């Protein structure tokens, strides 16, 4: 295994993406990529695959890969020229670059491709490149498979809900009949002792915007016991359904453990005889109706009073029990798959810089022998 020092421009040729006004887009088979990832599809492709894409303006530092033909937008840099290198290896290599070091000093900072082409990189022989991308690709493929399975389980769950609880059923009660609606609060940001990294889970709408996970136990910041006592935040039990009531309205998640939230939520603690699954599915199916209740103001928000008064058809106990029996295993499987994905992502992110630098010899990596202790060691050393 040999490694050679080169510049980025010697292994890939980044180019500016293509204009495509939204008014000219026609849904089709080809993915459209902006600086923040896929943003829809188009009936035509601008380039053939494989293709790597990263941000030129806007979101900087994220890197995307398309095996198929696609359309990189003008906010991105892309390349289909890999100069004899493994395209997937180049994709992972780009993920390790210090992109922000190459931002232009202008009113709207962006990446100048001529500057970033001078970035020094160290690359191995082609055989080692494919071995590295193979290991990292296996982890990404498993994450993708788990995500697709979770999506399928979500479809099953909502289809069963729709069958048992039709949308045209007569209203017989309000949301507060099926659970307790609880708001949140924020400890003073001026008191650093109120916040920590391993305390009481404290969730904000931004935390939900940064994840596609259905279950959540911690956000960016946790709060301390002192921080919790300093404000009116309430501890929501595991299984509570979090619903963002402003900025924006309609993010939904399930508490994987006891959590608190900031004031951007009106969360529901379901009654035992109703269950988490029913409340979750009701909110998913009615989030646009709820959002409309908060519209028409300068700062759209759904108040606690509004939330409590949302009309619904109170489920019969027999139907509720049937749905809970069906939904319980699905929720457990979804939570387990999300947990596995976080572990796989942690492993991938720990391996990535070490494989790319040659610190870890890829020929010595056996994914079948990797356990949580190995992952913990990698993360600690990272």
Predicted ranges, named:
Residues 1-34, 120-186, 197, 313, ...:
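Non-catalytic DNA-recognition/assembly elements of restriction-modification systems
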Residues 2-123, 173-315, 363-382:
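DNA target-recognition domains and sequence-specific DNA-contacting regions of bacterial/archaeal
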